[in-house]
């Protein structure tokens, strides 16, 4: 198949108020060209709506009928993300007729990993049929449900794209990709077609929630609070005893599985330092689970903008962190690019989840296509 232009959309569980939207040219196996990338801010009313939706989702917890707010939020975010796609494409001098497919991840409102004797559950809000009717192009969406129904974790799905990036950079098994979003996830490849991916632990979500709870903004900007604080080593050691961290992969997390309450009772600075150290230390424990411990981590996602977390990856995880830009990648765009890449795989009928990533029995296709 010849490479086609595809748009990818991602809004993370950290709820930073932005739509990540990226355009790439790909055949679903290699990246032929990187197009533009943008952060399109949600209107404040949609951001507040999504915060309330996530709160109601936690109360619902997959029991009984879905909250009515889901339908309202789904339509609002679908229309807003459709507008973001159109603006990016037309700003690049293309029309929607030039776009082969849009990868619409939607907004994860709740994710529950499978347990012995029970399948997992996952819910992403996003109306692919509505987006198709607005944009007039094919839309791949609902990427995770089929994997979960087949007994998989439903996450992480970025491994196929991360592996393509590593292959294009010519790295070996001493380098892995770490994405620091609301949750942290890692992808490792041996360079010969075998790869592993899983969620390592929390990243930005508990830290951001902790900062917000003190009325000090949306995040620990530039890692300043964490840098000024002192890690509570006793508390950190206790947190690192959590069974998830030593459990074998495949494994996945919801953004609320590790919460801001981990820092209860600490000053803002010490809490930020301790939560940052926990993120980095959890990555270190994850590296110990891999077939070979990498020496370098290429870091994407919002967390790489936090110098405190980046330096703690070196001191607490025993690895050299490298910003994605050092490889010529766009660290804020990787997840949106990923869903453009996966959309082309959905279009081509190629697998998007694998035994080494989500734990499904065999490589499997996923996603639905509105056309």
From Swiss-Prot:
Keywords: ATP-binding, Carbohydrate metabolism, Kinase, Nucleotide-binding, Transferase. It catalyses: 1,6-anhydro-N-acetyl-beta-muramate + ATP + H2O = N-acetyl-D-muramate 6-phosphate + ADP + H(+). Its EC number is 2.7.1.170. ATP binds at residues 12-20. It is an enzyme of class 2 (transferase). The keyword Kinase applies. SUPFAM superfamilies: Actin-like ATPase domain (SSF53067). GO terms for biological process: 1,6-anhydro-N-acetyl-beta-muramic acid catabolic process; amino sugar metabolic process; peptidoglycan turnover. Pfam families: AnmK. Pathway: Amino-sugar metabolism; 1,6-anhydro-N-acetylmuramate degradation; Cell wall biogenesis; peptidoglycan recycling. Belongs to the anhydro-N-acetylmuramic acid kinase family. Catalyzes the specific phosphorylation of 1,6-anhydro-N-acetylmuramic acid (anhMurNAc) with the simultaneous cleavage of the 1,6-anhydro ring, generating MurNAc-6-P. Is required for the utilization of anhMurNAc either imported from the medium or derived from its own cell wall murein, and thus plays a role in cell wall recycling. This is Anhydro-N-acetylmuramic acid kinase. It comes from Rhizobium rhizogenes (strain K84 / ATCC BAA-868). The lineage of its organism: Bacteria, Pseudomonadati, Pseudomonadota, Alphaproteobacteria, Hyphomicrobiales.
